[in-house]
Amino acid sequence: MATTGRVLLVGKRAQVLDRLAEALRAEGLQVRQETDLDRIRTQVDVSAVDVLALGRAVTGERRERLVAAVRARNPALRVVDGLAPITPLLVAQIQEALTAPGTESRIVAAAGVEVSDRSVAISLRRGADVTVVYHRLDSLYRAHEQLLHSGPLGRGHHWFPVKGTVTRGERFLVVRADGQTTVHQLV
């Protein structure tokens, strides 16, 4: 899905930023990377940025100061807090920020995990061509990805079995439905 937009990536680990920047450029986005928060506040033209994507290491007061300083110069800026260092997941989060309609206009109404039968569930407001990808970050910070569905689905609730564990690690679902991308943290 090609999306246009300008993204500023901010994080601690240059290697993660490099992989993410490469993937975003492949999607047609303009990307700048930064690991120095002070430089962003003083030297980066944030008026030319659509999305500020923050890594998980940018938290607390440092995050709040940065977002406030950047939003003071660009009130329309969308901020994405990276859920996990999983490149396809982060790409989906940024695509969601760039293209998401209002909550009521979203095709995907809800998503969740069904621990008892090792599956994930989604609820659609209308029928659509849907791709569902399950991401998991295990306790050793290894990323696991499973394509659960790709094809048409009708309106309503749908369940998809997950191979392996659904109870360990950090879990996420990326759902693409007729050009809309939504990211769901599964708890």
Give, region by region, the residue ranges found by the protein language model.
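Extracellular ectodomain segments of secreted/surface proteins
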Residues: E96-R125
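Solvent-exposed serine/threonine-rich low-complexity stretches and specific carbohydrate-binding patches
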Residues: D138-W159
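Conserved phosphotransfer microenvironments
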Residues: L54-A69
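Conserved acidic segment of CheY-like receiver
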Residues: T4-A14, L20, L52
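Ser/Thr/Gly-rich flexible loops in soluble cytosolic domains mediating phosphotransfer, phosphorylation
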Residues: A69-I107
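Acidic, metal-coordinating helix/loop segments flanking the phosphotransfer/catalytic sites
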Residues: T35-V49
